[in-house]
Amino acid sequence: MFAAICLDEANENQPVYITLKLEPLDGDFLRQQYEDIIPGYYMNKVHWNSIKPDGEVPDELLMEMLDKSYALVLHSFSKKRQQEILLTTYCGLDCTNCEYKEPCKCNGCVATKGMPFHAEETPCPVAACVMQKGISFCGECTEFPCQLLTDYSNDTEHGDNPPGARIAACKMIKCLLEKK
């Protein structure tokens, strides 16, 4: 968990507070700047802070705090667990909101060992390459971004929207896994 949302049942379950993890010094500083940021409800008050979402805290700052909270919590896990959280595909494609996930019972090529719903008899070539090299995802490859991944990412019919999105995702995942 990197955030908790406290809801107001009397007010149609509108958020009363969003509780996020922050570095202790950042939390202290922000609590001094904004009265809508208080020590976290029901949490370790050193690291967790509750923010009134419709208060005086600027949306940009709230988004930045969400990102930092996610990174702090993610990096508290082992590298193996981080990969389990971040990687559902070998190529960086984000399958979490795929319209075929539920009807086709597909959890991405990592879970299906390279055989997602669209791979009928042979594994996806990108997944097969990653598995053959014994790496976790394309971003760990010494040839990244290779021609195979680039071709998949920029394919006009079945590629990314926008083109190159899975390459950018691999770069981001690689950065997240390297930070510690």
Sequence positions of predicted segments:
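Short, conserved beta-strand/beta-arch hydrophobic-aromatic motifs that form part
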Residues: 1-45, 56
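Short coil/turn segments at secondary-structure boundaries
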Residues: 39, 53-60, 129-132, 137
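Amphipathic alpha-helical interface surfaces
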Residues: 26, 30-33, 47, 61-65, ...
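Well-ordered alpha/beta subsegment
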Residues: 42-85
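Short, conserved beta-strand segments within well-ordered enzyme catalytic domains
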Residues: 19-21, 50-52, 140
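Cysteine-centered metal-binding/redox modules
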Residues: 83-180
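Active-site donor-binding loop signature of nucleotide-sugar glycosyltransferases
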Residues: 7, 53, 143
